[in-house]
Amino acid sequence: MASGKEIKGKIGSIKNTQKITSAMEMVAASKMKKAQERMASGRPYAQNMLKVIGHIANGNLEYRHPYLEEREVKRVGYIVISTDRGLCGGLNTNEFKLVTQDVKKWREQGVEVDFAALGSKACSFFNRFGGKLLAAESGLGDKPSVSDVVGVVRVMLKAYDEGQIDRVFLVFNDFVNTMTQKPVINQLLPLPKSEDEEYQHRWDYIYEPDPKEILEALMVRYIESQVYQGVVENAASEQAARMVAMKAATDNAGNLIDELQLVYNKARQAAITQEISEIVSGAAAV
């Protein structure tokens, strides 16, 4: 059994760590609230863009944009959004597991895979995982903007335009609620036709001045909006996961302190009992 002094030292060390995890929990809660506000403010735009694109994909167009056309799949690309920092439970691990399972299915069909990473954890993971990393961006911070994702998006669009990749997916952690964050894979290109009844009726659009020019700008803006919304959803998920992880760490530290305090009390009691026994034995010898 460790000495009372050693146990006291461990208790003190754990208490210091507990203060840190408690502070990190409060910081994460504050950041999560702000991230939720950004996420909520961006959702209407992203959803309306999705709605417009859904109608266009099912519409009778005088000009069919290449992003609307299916083609033989020889190579696919994933834009994977992760965190820059750790201490957020299994958030990144679960996401990477989902991606690797999906990649395995494509490779079994003889399809090659490329990646683009947003977040340092994704950058480091896919550098080790194998496959071609076409673009990488990290250090998005707590207040990401659309300009932060434009570079990665343009690289993937260029690869798609040139026929280097035939399908593009977006991977991120969808914020369901504080306790639940779900990794998802959404197809970006070609634009999937929605099965929603709202999009089933055909819409005829009149484009002014030029349908090609308008659709070119609209498609790029749509992709950028979806990737940006994935970034803010992932940011909210990160802070929620970190808050939960730090609360669990704080609670575990409290339980460990209680257990060590009990061990310390037993050790102290054993030491006192030993001293009394020695005194009694000495007195009896006299």
From Swiss-Prot:
Pfam families: ATP-synt (PF00231). The keyword Membrane applies. It comes from the Bacteria. GO terms for molecular function: ATP binding; proton-transporting ATP synthase activity, rotational mechanism. Its main location: membrane. Signal peptide: none annotated. It is a peripheral membrane protein. One of its GO terms (biological process) is proton motive force-driven plasma membrane ATP synthesis. One of its GO terms (cellular component) is proton-transporting ATP synthase complex. Keywords: ATP synthesis, Cell inner membrane, Cell membrane, CF(1), Hydrogen ion transport, Ion transport, Membrane, Transport. It is found in: Cell inner membrane. Produces ATP from ADP in the presence of a proton gradient across the membrane. The gamma chain is believed to be important in regulating ATPase activity and the flow of protons through the CF(0) complex. Belongs to the ATPase gamma chain family. PANTHER family: ATP SYNTHASE GAMMA CHAIN, ATP SYNTHASE SUBUNIT GAMMA, MITOCHONDRIAL. F-type ATPases have 2 components, CF(1) - the catalytic core - and CF(0) - the membrane proton channel. CF(1) has five subunits: alpha(3), beta(3), gamma(1), delta(1), epsilon(1). CF(0) has three main subunits: a, b and c. This is ATP synthase gamma chain. It comes from Alteromonas mediterranea (strain DSM 17117 / CIP 110805 / LMG 28347 / Deep ecotype). The lineage of its organism: Bacteria, Pseudomonadati, Pseudomonadota, Gammaproteobacteria, Alteromonadales. The gene is atpG.
